[in-house]
């Protein structure tokens, strides 16, 4: 799809050719108050009160999500006009805008319309800008058009008719909106990669497949890539990481990707993604029901790859390193057993009380490995605990950090990206739950505060740099009829990196 921006000051009576320009459809918003403004007011004037008559007749009441196509409207260059209900004007916030945009796209995608003029991004949205609206509309459209059918015997290869979207914005918003359109398309491409990797079955998306995906990404976007095999990891004394792969015939892969967009000596942001391509729980076997969804236990890794793809396409002036410890967690005669003690790369010994708490075992060695990059910040992303789902459900990702400044940046990014996160506690008192009689620490701390003690475990390996942990167990995929990977938290991570690149620190 092609996205472009065109300035148009409706309020000043300057439509800049939008009314007479040729297109398949122009999208216009109508509030529930039935008061016309902006593009709707101009079109009403150009059509001698047509919209006013339609509203008075009750054909369009402006209620949120309603749509109405008008055909061959006299005085309008577009062959169709799509009216979209916006709901209450004084409550037109980001959610209402998103709902309106999705309603418009659904209506348009049900037709053979190819080229559209989209005016909704010019509407006044509470606490949001026009460039935000452009990017949000692009992401909403790309989410609706995403499909995963490549594993079917007859994949759906049909192309959507909709190809070209022109966003109208006010003259002063044009520059920012053009950047937002570029970033929105790049972000959608990154999210699609993350979704694809998550939705692939685990007999396809193995640790080796993730490594090959990273290599292809490096080739396509001129990134630096290194993949460490098990012998190299043994030489680095990654005993914790390797303990998880002990039961699998699939070789573990330790993947390192580097994007160099900032100054050569500028400290990078390191993203560490949990890459368990299938998690049976190991000897501490999971229940059979729903185990198929454990192919999504690599969504942290997928989000790192998707974020790096988006960042590379955006050309952000920042250095980013992606680290992915990739394994399968399988039961077998060679698998790690409950009660085994392993030694991490840092040298700390870990009593493995539960082999289903494996994510932290691979992440801790990756977090130690990250020290060599002298990072400005490290963020790990993991489908780590079911306890986080109990605490936060499926709306907010869990954010853990002792660094208030870093946590604040991530929360700001989550709000800007509409990819919500909620800060969770990380008090030292929780560390007592990880005490072991036989090793330096245990890999679980009991049922109370399970997501917190998991983050506390990781914090023991992050003393060398500012660090945050995102638990995405509740947000990385959906179950039920809408089963599939969401692409989160790529928007949050990308926005964090956009903000870091913009403030100048990343180029120093």
From Swiss-Prot:
Its EC number is 3.4.11.1, 3.4.11.10. The keyword Mitochondrion does not apply. One of its GO terms (biological process) is proteolysis. It is an enzyme of class 3 (hydrolase). Its cofactor is Mn(2+). Keywords: Aminopeptidase, Cytoplasm, Hydrolase, Manganese, Metal-binding, Protease. Transmembrane segments: none annotated. Gene3D superfamilies: Leucine Aminopeptidase, subunit E, domain 1 (3.40.220.10), Zn peptidases (3.40.630.10). It comes from Paraburkholderia xenovorans (strain LB400). This is Probable cytosol aminopeptidase. Presumably involved in the processing and regular turnover of intracellular proteins. Catalyzes the removal of unsubstituted N-terminal amino acids from various peptides. HAMAP family: Cytosol_peptidase_M17. Mn(2+) 1 binds at residues 279, 356, 358. It comes from the Bacteria. Coiled coil: none annotated. GO terms for molecular function: manganese ion binding; metalloaminopeptidase activity. The keyword Hydrolase applies. The active site is at 286, 360. One of its GO terms (cellular component) is cytoplasm. It is found in: Cytoplasm. SUPFAM superfamilies: Macro domain-like, Zn-dependent exopeptidases. It catalyses: Release of an N-terminal amino acid, Xaa-|-Yaa-, in which Xaa is preferably Leu, but may be other amino acids including Pro although not Arg or Lys, and Yaa may be Pro. Amino acid amides and methyl esters are also readily hydrolyzed, but rates on arylamides are exceedingly low; Release of an N-terminal amino acid, preferentially leucine, but not glutamic or aspartic acids. Mn(2+) 2 binds at residues 274, 279, 297, 358. Belongs to the peptidase M17 family.
């Amino acid at each position: 799809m092609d996205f472009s921006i065109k300035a148009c000051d409706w309020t000043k009576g300057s439509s800049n050719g939008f009314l007479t320009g040729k297109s398949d459809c122009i999208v216009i918003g109508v509030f529930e108050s039935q008061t016309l403004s902006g593009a709707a007011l101009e079109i009403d004037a150009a059509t001698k009160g047509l919209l006013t008559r339609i509203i008075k007749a009750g054909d369009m009441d402006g209620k949120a999500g309603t749509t109405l196509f008008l055909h061959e409207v006299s005085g309008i260059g577009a062959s169709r006009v799509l009216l979209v209900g916006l709901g209450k004007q004084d409550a037109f916030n980001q959610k209402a805008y998103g709902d309106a945009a999705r309603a418009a796209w659904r209506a348009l995608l049900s037709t053979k319309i190819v080229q559209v003029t989209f005016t909704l991004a010019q509407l006044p949205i509470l606490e949001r800008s026009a460039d935000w609206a452009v990017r949000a509309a692009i992401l909403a459209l790309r989410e609706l058009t995403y499909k995963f059918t490549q594993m079917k015997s007859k994949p759906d290869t049909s192309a959507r008719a909709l190809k070209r979207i022109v966003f109208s914005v006010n003259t002063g918003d044009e520059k920012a909106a053009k950047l937002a359109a570029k970033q929105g398309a790049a972000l959608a491409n990154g999210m699609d990669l993350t979704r694809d990797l998550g939705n692939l079955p685990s007999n396809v998306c193995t640790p080796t497949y993730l490594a090959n995906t990273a290599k292809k990404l490096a080739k396509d976007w001129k990134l630096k890539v290194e993949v460490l095999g098990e012998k190299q990891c043994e030489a680095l004394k990654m005993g914790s990481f390797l303990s998880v792969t002990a039961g699998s015939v699939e070789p573990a892969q330790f993947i390192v990707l580097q994007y160099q967009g900032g100054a050569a000596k500028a400290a990078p942001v390191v993203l560490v993604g949990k890459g368990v391509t299938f998690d049976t729980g190991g000897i501490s076997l999971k229940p059979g029901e729903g185990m198929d969804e454990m192919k999504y236990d690599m969504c942290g890794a997928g989000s790192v790859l998707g974020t790096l793809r988006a960042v590379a396409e955006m050309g952000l002036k920042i250095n980013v390193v992606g680290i992915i410890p990739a394994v399968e967690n399988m039961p077998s005669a060679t698998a790690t057993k409950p009660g085994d003690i392993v030694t991490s790369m840092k040298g700390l010994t870990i009593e493995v009380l539960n082999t289903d708490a494996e994510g932290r075992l691979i992440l801790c060695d990756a977090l130690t490995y990250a020290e060599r990059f002298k990072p400005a910040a490290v963020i790990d992303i993991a489908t780590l605990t079911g306890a986080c789902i109990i605490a936060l459900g499926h709306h907010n990702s869990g954010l853990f950090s002792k660094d208030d400044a870093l946590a604040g940046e991530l929360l700001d990014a989550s709000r800007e990206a509409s990819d919500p996160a909620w800060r969770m506690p990380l008090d030292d008192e929780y560390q007592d739950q990880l005490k072991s009689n036989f090793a330096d620490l245990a890999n679980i701390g009991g049922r109370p505060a399970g997501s917190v003690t998991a983050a506390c475990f990781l914090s023991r390996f992050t003393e060398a740099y500012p660090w945050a942990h995102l638990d995405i167990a509740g947000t990385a995929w959906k179950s039920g009829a809408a089963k599939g990977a969401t692409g989160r938290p790529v928007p949050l991570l990308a926005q964090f990196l956009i903000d870091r690149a913009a403030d100048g620190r990343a180029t120093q």
